[in-house]
Amino acid sequence: MKSIDLKKLKLDKFKNVRVENFPKEFDLDIESTNNDVEVIIYYIDQLSDVGKFIKACTSSPLPKENRTILVYRKGRKDGVNRDSIFGPLRKDKRFTLKAPMLCSISDELSACVMGKIV
């Protein structure tokens, strides 16, 4: 399994994290839960996953202080990249960027940190 540095995502104050659509080859070292979710970490494998991410976040009763995190593979040449992923989200007023916004969490993965406006 490939390890990931989640410290950059600044999730220390959150206890309940739900992980969705993540490849088994990566070890997040987090116990995923569906109870009282405060953070959703969602892996984007194809562009259609952006809509699924939005649906997962908007249908979840997240608290006011929350994080919604998109993770995607770096250096892809198939059209799934930062700009194509964030295009729809820039227009969606239900989300706002949160620190650290965009960061590398491994040699292969990048993450964008947002919050759902509640």
What are these regions (language model features)?
Residues 1-118:
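Charge-dense, helix-prone N-terminal extensions
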